[in-house]
Curated annotation (Swiss-Prot):
This is Integrin alpha pat-2. Required for muscle development probably through the regulation of the actin-myosin cytoskeleton. During the formation of neuromuscular junctions at the larval stage, negatively regulates membrane protrusion from body wall muscles, probably through lamins such as epi-1, lam-2 and unc-52. Required for distal tip cell migration and dorsal pathfinding. Required for egg-laying. May play a role in cell motility and cell-cell interactions. It comes from Caenorhabditis briggsae. GO terms for molecular function: integrin binding; transmembrane signaling receptor activity. The keyword Hydrolase does not apply. It is a single-pass type I membrane protein.
Length: 1224
């Protein structure tokens, strides 16, 4: 079966259902063009109405206007007593009926004065107008009529009614609630409002009327059976217990035979009964209680069931059925919100319940018809309309006074049927269709059952009190059309081209279809009528495969191309106007051809023929007769089909055996790799008979994009594939359909490769489900369908390997334990040799790393607080577009403000940047600005200092007090918007002396001995750190030492699960420097180098008599983010160590130069004094003996040695650009 389609049998059933639906919706025979519309303004004209035969065979429409000023001379001077009008059914004329023969208000002697005992002002006369089934008796009531009881002190609305027979000449007044002596009061009959509703029995029981009085006995309500010939014969229903208070029984009444005795009984509506659900109470003609009827279909509080009533035999079983209105019913299930698809309540749509009498006194079946317009109050009024369409079943009209356009009101026609009533109204008449469309509250009152124009069809009347209208709507006669359409032959072979279509298409396969019609009439129907026929070829197919011949259309003037035809040259739909004679069949013959290039050669070619009656603008025929209406209880169209010849054998049934297999080119899909394409090998095989319109369907999983399909093998081309819809399904999957053949022959194998590519924006994160299935337009046998579908799952993984390496340059530094540099140094090269630690963090793949962190803990100070590895510059990151570093304790970078000689800077040219790297630098502009701001915070101004030195030297002014006192540190602090800056934090907020109190060794010099130091005094602890984290979460010095030890024992990098992290290590109290580096966008085999340059502060080693050992920095690296939030692997740690080698002391001492000069001068002075003394003594004047040759040995003097810092501690080879520029 094809994706998204139904089997042929199912589609045919759907078509038949559509035909029934069309007949249900469009059927009507109430004429809206020739309406007799009566109008009177501002008096509630149309509040009630009914037909009444004033004279035999001469019906009038009696309309109540309960707010009217009467023209009755007997009621002169009484304000708005109300009036009843007799209106013509043929033209818009009315006259008031004077039924009250009493002169004004009745008066009675009260002492010596005559005083009124009644009040007819505002009595609402005309609120109830009701006739019997034969429409020869009439009841007219004033429910607000007031009576003054015997003491003249109590005035209560007892209500009154007038009864007429055979005209209006003789009338009787009945006020059943007006009873003496003293039955007044709300607890009795005083507020009864007799005549609020009324009903006149039609079967036997001819001398009585039933009056509803909903206000008696605390508004429990009652029914009075008033004898029309005896005023005092007026029995009523009994008083109930207080739980029935305010039920308002008698709000509506109707009569019918409910016990099978042939005498009309009474049914009363109780809209507030049954806990406000509403109910009906049935009494016999003698007012004996029979049964209660309640809504069992969809009951709800406040629906006001029983607010309107009608009685009719709707299913023609000979028993009277009851129709009950529930105008305030709310529909919670029919309407859905267009966006959310949630069901929306439709308030006050109203509904009608039909109680079918299945046996005498037994109502065993309920049917419900629900309104279609919110606030419309469908079921506010009801009337038995008779058999409107002459199908043998009585119909019902329902008023909805606030439905339709602009809430002006509407009337619905519900047809009876053998099952009761039809599920939906057959006609909806809106106020906008009547007259000029000005009626309001149209449908507040309805009446029917009288043929007023003599065409044998009962007509209806509708009241609209808000606009003061009453309308008489005539019923049109009914025309029933029967017919059939048949093919010339049962098959068409598209390869047998037997007719010439045109020069372009040449010859094609042609066939004829024959269609026959005739009509019969119900009522006064004409002998001949015009109909429009519409022929639709191949109307089951999205694209037609069969067409009418253009030359045939042009040759017949009665035929034209139908509007909506998908083609014009050779149309698939045509229209033809024909004239039929009543009772005579007429046939038509049309030729069509089937396209030889059609794809679907298995499905039959269906066609349909629809017919409609051609109406005139006036809606009338010759002789001023109403036009007929089409009977929609029979189909409005006829259908048939013709099969296409194929290779399916004698049974004309091809049964394929399709099978599909699929396999992916990988067992696991890795995210974040360069290769994001997956291939799915799909093979389809047909092991049965020919498979027509064979299609392969496969799902492109969520997170993938379709990349095309290729055929495997040299004998076939790639199938054409396209998505089945414009949007993915609810799971984000796209379904593609591929044509594999029409037909796909038996034993044919089709192999294809589907390429899908993972989306870069939203790649797959869950296991990938691969679904594929194959289908065709012909059905397979049930036991072979299982292999038409294949489903398998491919797991998704994310795999990257973070690598961390480091080394020291140089690996060993020699220093002398006896030689110190001078303390007043100014250049960085005077404090000791350069020591740099280089770290490399890399991704060994295969998946990408979105973000990683590298945290380096640097040994800036010794245990005694002296400078150790003195950082001279901020860390160098290479390549700069892959990471950035910041020193958290920025004051530890060149804290003595020495001139940086830049001897550590390599001389090689910088690494060339790609355009993408320049783009990255532009993106990081905000970070550079931040860094500049930090730098300006600590180095606010720069001046050039040239005293005692050659060339410019940069000196930075700092907060000397803070640096000298070492009372605090600079920390990087982020606000809520993730923007940050460095702030100065005093030590008393961060430092905790407990971190060192029990430690004997520093992590940067593991294994070396030192002089025991004095304990550091403890400072007051804070409850928490600046970030709000508890102090117990901070790492201790021992954690750093153990991490260094762990790395050394492992000989390099180690997976670390200890307490150290970026947040837990606080270098402010551990005499270290925390360097935070953020690394990003590392693809496979990419790396980042981070190098920290420092100088070994040799004076600290000499002062602390350190015999040597290792100085170590510690680095932590971890993946913090991937593109797909995959679980991260453990943290890596490694320690980089520099060995300090203490060398033996040299002879001599380093003495100041002035001591040497002083010694020379003293020696010279002594020599001069000695010469003068010898000269004075005449030493040089004595006779000298002969000269002897002798060797004078000079006295040994201690050699003076001077420390040359640059030559001893900073050999030139340590500054070679090769060593400091080399990368691992």
């Amino acid at each position: 079966m094809r994706e998204g389609s139904f089997p042929r049998r199912t589609r045919l059933l759907c078509l038949l259902a559509a035909v029934v639906l069309i007949s249900t919706v469009t059927s009507f025979n109430i004429d809206t063009k020739n309406v007799v519309l009566h109008h009177m303004a501002n008096n509630y004209f149309g509040y009630s109405l009914d037909f009444y035969n004033e004279q035999k065979g001469m019906p009038v429409l009696v309309v109540g206007a309960p707010e009217a000023e009467t023209t009755n001379p007997n009621l002169s001077g009484i304000r708005r007593p109300g009036a009843v009008y007799a209106c013509s059914v043929n033209r818009p004329t009315c006259r008031e009926v004077h039924v009250d023969k009493m002169k004004g208000n009745l008066k009675k002697l009260n002492g010596s004065h005559l005083v009124p005992i009644e009040d007819k002002a505002y009595q609402f006369f005309g609120a109830t107008v009701k006739s019997n089934d034969k429409h020869d008796k009439l009841l007219m009531c004033a429910p607000k009529y007031k009576y003054f009881y015997s003491k003249f002190e109590v005035i209560e609305p007892v209500g009154t009614c007038f009864y007429a027979e055979n005209g209006f000449e003789k009338t009787e007044e009945f006020s059943s609630c007006k009873q003496e002596p003293a039955r007044h009061g709300r607890h009795r009959l005083g507020y009864g409002q007799c005549g609020f509703s009324g009903a006149i029995p039609g079967k036997k029981n001819q001398d009585r009327v039933f009056l509803g009085a909903p206000g008696v006995w605390y508004w429990q309500g009652a029914i009075f059976s008033q004898n029309t010939k005896n005023q005092t014969d007026r029995p009523n229903t009994e008083y109930g217990s207080k739980e029935y208070d305010h039920d308002m029984m008698g709000y509506a009444t109707a009569t019918g035979d409910f016990d099978g005795d042939g005498i009309d009984d009474i049914v009363a509506g109780v809209p507030r009964g049954n806990d406000l659900h509403g109910k009906l109470v049935l009494y016999t003609s003698k007012l004996k209680m029979m049964i209660n009827l309640t809504d069992e279909v969809s009951t709800q509080h406040g629906q006001y069931c029983g607010g309107a009533l009608a009685v009719a035999d709707v299913n023609k079983d000979g028993r009277d059925d009851i129709i009950m209105g529930c105008p305030f019913y709310t529909d919670y299930g029919s309407v859905k919100d267009a966006k959310t698809q949630e069901r929306k309540p439709q308030y006050d749509v109203g509904k009608v319940i039909v109680f079918l009498q299945t046996a005498p006194g037994v109502f065993g079946k309920q049917l419900a018809v629900v309104g279609d317009d919110q606030w419309g109050r469908f079921g506010h009024s009801l009337a038995a309309a008779g058999d409107l369409n002459l199908d043998g079943y009585n119909d019902v009209i329902v008023g909805a006074p606030y439905a339709g356009k602009n809430k002006q009101g509407a009337v619905y026609v519900i047809h009876g049927s053998k099952d009761g009533v039809r599920e939906k109204p057959t006609q909806k008449i809106e106020a906008s269709q009547i007259g000029h469309g000005t009626a309001r509250a149209f449908g507040f009152a309805v009446a029917g059952g009288v043929d007023v124009d003599g065409n044998g069809m009962p007509d209806i009347a509708v009241g609209a009190w808000k606009s003061g209208n009453a309308a008489v709507l005539l019923t049109k006669p009914v025309v029933t059309v029967t017919g059939a359409t048949e093919p010339e032959s049962a098959l068409i072979n598209v390869e047998e081209k037997n007719c010439d279509v045109d020069g372009k298409l040449g010859k094609q396969a042609c066939r004829h279809i024959n269609t026959c019609f005739k009509y019969e009439g119900k009522g006064d129907t004409p002998n001949d009528l015009e109909f429009d026929l519409r022929f639709n070829l191949d109307d089951h197919s999205p694209e037609p495969r069969a067409y009418f011949l253009q030359k045939d259309v042009k040759s017949d003037r009665s035929i034209k191309v139908a509007s909506g035809s998908k083609t014009r040259d050779h149309p698939s739909s045509i229209e033809q106007r024909v004239r039929l004679e009543k009772g005579r069949q007429k046939c038509f013959r049309h030729r069509f051809f089937a396209s030889s290039t059609m794809k679907d050669k298995l499905s039959p070619i269906h066609w349909s023929v629809n017919y409609t009656y051609v109406e005139s603008k006036s809606g009338k025929l010759r002789g001023d007769k109403l036009e007929p209406a089409i009977d929609t209880t029979v189909p409005l169209s006829f259908q048939n089909k013709i099969n296409i010849a194929n290779n399916c054998g004698k049974d004309d049934l091809c049964v394929p055996d399709l099978k599909v297999t699929a396999v992916a080119d990988r067992e696991k899909f890795l995210l974040g790799t360069q290769d994001n394409t997956m291939l799915i090998n799909v093979t389809v095989q047909n092991g049965g008979e020919d498979s027509y319109e064979t299609k392969l369907y496969f799902d492109v999983p969520q997170g993938f994009e379709y990349g095309g399909i290729e055929s495997v093998g040299a004998d076939g081309s790639a199938p054409a594939c396209s998505p089945t819809s414009d949007e993915p399904d609810s799971d984000g999957k796209w379904t593609f359909a591929c044509d594999l053949g029409n037909p796909l022959p038996a034993n044919k194998v089709v192999s294809s490769v589907v390429r899908v590519t993972a989306s870069s924006d939203k790649p797959p994160l869950a296991p990938i489900s691969i679904n594929a299935h194959v289908n065709s337009s012909n059905d397979e046998e049930a036991h072979t369908i299982a292999d038409n579908k294949v489903t398998f799952t491919i797991p998704v993984d994310f795999k990257n390997q973070l690598s961390l390496n480091g080394r020291s340059n140089p690996e060993q530094v020699d220093f002398s334990m006896t030689n110190k540099t001078r303390s007043d140094v100014f250049d960085d090269n005077e404090i000791g040799p350069v020591v740099s630690h280089l770290y490399q963090i890399s991704n060994r793949g295969p998946s990408e790393i979105d973000a990683a962190t590298l945290d380096i803990f640097w040994p800036s100070f010794s245990t005694e607080g002296g400078h150790l590895l003195y950082i001279i510059t901020e860390p160098v990151v290479n390549p700069p577009n892959k990471g950035r570093c910041r020193v958290k304790q920025l004051q530890n970078v060149n804290p003595l403000n020495l001139r940086i000689t830049n001897e550590h800077v390599p001389t090689e040219p910088p690494v060339a940047k790609t355009p993408n790297e320049y783009s990255r630098e532009e993106d990081d502009e905000s970070y550079e600005d931040e860094t500049t701001t930090q730098s300006q915070t600590h180095h606010q101004t720069r001046t050039e200092h040239t005293q005692h030195h050659q060339g410019p030297v940069h000196v930075y002014e700092r907060d000397e007090d803070k640096i000298r006192q070492n009372t605090g540190n600079w920390q990087y602090v982020e606000d809520k918007k993730k923007k940050g800056d460095y702030e100065y934090i005093p030590d008393d907020q961060e430092y905790d002396g407990d971190d060192f109190e029990d430690d004997d060794e520093d992590f940067d010099r593991a294994g070396s001995k030192r002089v025991k130091r004095a304990p550091v005094p403890k400072k007051k602890k804070k409850e928490g750190s600046r970030s709000g984290e508890p102090r117990s979460d901070k790492a201790r010095f021992s954690d750093l030492r153990e991490a260094v030890k762990l790395s050394k024992e492992a000989g390099g990098v180690v997976d670390y699960k200890g307490p150290l992290s970026r947040a837990s290590v606080d270098c402010n109290g551990l005499r270290c420097t925390h360097i935070e580096c953020d690394i990003y966008d590392l693809k496979e085999d990419e790396f980042v180098l981070v190098e920290i340059f420092s100088r070994l502060y040799t004076n600290t080693l000499v002062d602390e008599r350190n015999p040597g050992g290792d100085i170590s920095s510690l680095a932590l690296a971890r993946v913090t983010s991937t593109k797909y939030n995959w679980p991260h692997k453990p943290t890596l740690i490694t320690a980089v160590s520099t060995n300090m080698n203490a060398i033996a002391s040299e002879e001599g001492r380093d003495l100041p130069w002035w001591l040497y000069l002083l010694a020379i001068l003293i020696g010279l002075a002594i020599l001069i004094l000695l010469i003068l003394l010898l000269w004075r003594c005449g030493f040089f004047k004595r006779n000298r003996p002969p000269t002897e040759h002798a060797e004078l040995r000079a006295e040994k003097q201690p050699a003076a040695h001077y420390a040359d810092t640059q030559s001893r501690y900073a050999p030139q080879d340590q500054y070679s650009q090769g060593r400091h520029g080399q990368m691992l």
